[in-house]
Amino acid sequence: MKIHLATDHAGLALKDKIKLHLTELGHEDIDHGAHEYDALDDYPDFIFPCAKAVAQDDQSRGIILGGSGQGEAMAANRIKGIRAAVYYNGPEEIIELSRQHNNANILSIGARFMSEKEIYRIIEIWFDTDFEAGRHQRRINKLDNY
């Protein structure tokens, strides 16, 4: 699967490690930046191109990172067709439900609140969980048609 990645400075080191993990899992990564550390960078500059790419290819997904992942998810969710779910720790069921009920196509991770090992585990759960459709598809259609 194609996985689009983006982060600001807060997730830069983790993004590069996630890329290696994705390769080990057999996925292709497309890196939308940041490519170098700049404490003054602005996350929308990287998140918008990533989210647009995911929106244009429904067979791909995205992983975005930031300090908390909140602003990044807000930016991604501005793009029609994107359903970004935020995770920065807590019950793993949150990740499962983001796929089962919400068909999340972007995972927004709070890099300052999770270890590398925790992030790998969450990514694998997210990849392994399918959308249930049914009554949930009706709700997704309403989001997409708004």
Briefly describe each language-model feature range:
Residues 65, 70-108:
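Mid-chain, well-packed structural core segment of small domains
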Residues 6, 30-33, 62-66:
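Short, conserved beta-strand edge motifs with alternating hydrophobic and charged residues
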Residues 46-64:
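Short, structured active-site "lid" loops
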Residues 4-6, 10-11, 92-146:
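C-terminal binding/interaction regions
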Residues 28-40:
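A short beta-strand-loop structural module common to alpha/beta enzyme folds
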Residues 2-3, 59-62, 81-83:
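Short active-site oxyanion
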Residues 5-25:
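Glycine-rich phosphate/diphosphate-binding loop of Rossmann-like nucleotide-binding domains
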